[in-house]
Amino acid sequence: MSVGNIQSPSNLPGLQNLNLNTNTNSQQSGQSVQDLIKQVEKDILNIIAALVQKAAQSAGGNTGNTGNAPAKDGNANAGANDPSKNDPSKSQGPQSANKTGNVDDANNQDPMQALMQLLEDLVKLLKAALHMQQPGGNDKGNGVGGANGAKGAGGQGGLAEALQEIEQILAQLGGGGAGAGGAGGGVGGAGGADGGSGAGGAGGANGADGGNGVNGNQANGPQNAGDVNGANGADDGSEDQGGLTGVLQKLMKILNALVQMMQQGGLGGGNQAQGGSKGAGNASPASGANPGANQPGSADDQSSGQNNLQSQIMDVVKEVVQILQQMLAAQNGGSQQSTSTQPM
């Protein structure tokens, strides 16, 4: 029948081709739209990432949050434009670095290094004081109008002696620690009492075997570790205080004597003649005295310079004494009663 022929698929090739073409076109159209949307999204994300990177670079390298650029609400620049991200005071890294930089160097510096630095400054000041006592190269310092106002010979001797002793101690400390004669025991485990002074000492590797000290005195292992008899550290009666403690105590005595000398006679080291430095200008000059010392005002200028230099010396001495007190207390477990300088 004709009805059967109409229902046969083989008799409808045109309808089948139409349906296939329609389905194919619909699928291609839908796929191209999805691809276009994905491409647009990809381009937007690339633009957003570029903007975030540029904002991070302009903010000084605060790129910690750039990885979170694709925000859910599309506002990817919110994190980059946040004032707190660009505020240096709220940046934890630089802030901690600044705090470290602002800490007083004296608190971070090793006490021994601080002590040696102050002693070097003190040596320079004392040398300047000695040079000031010798105007025009007069070794005896009698040049202020012949009035002996400075008492140069006596004062120079006191300062020169203190300077020499301080330089000796500075050399001991800089040469591997005080008590170098037995400092080797610190490494070999023999420096039980004064082990703190043994680091870097002369003959440290042979400390337990009795390594040679500074002047050749052998350290007899645990028995004589830290002995400073060979390091010129006990010539003032402090032989019983071995190692670093003895040297620090000797330095304390030297500084106390220096302070007393300066308090009694200043940098001149003696009592001025009647009339003081102002009257020295008209006094008859001694033989070999500097002619410039008789000019009006020269004695006043020298006195002003001496007072300024003396003030600087006293300031450094006070700082040295503070460090010495701390180091002596640490050496003796806080039981050491060290002598402090008298106030100016």
UniProtKB/Swiss-Prot annotation:
The keyword Secreted applies. Signal peptide: none annotated. It comes from the Bacteria. Residues 89-108, 295-311 have a biased composition (Polar residues). Acts as a specific hypersensitive response (HR) elicitor. Has activity on tobacco (non-host plant) and petunia but is without activity on tomato (host plant); PopA3 seems to be more active than a PopA1-PopA2 mixture. GO terms for cellular component: extracellular region. This is Protein PopA1. It comes from Ralstonia nicotianae (strain ATCC BAA-1114 / GMI1000) (Ralstonia solanacearum).
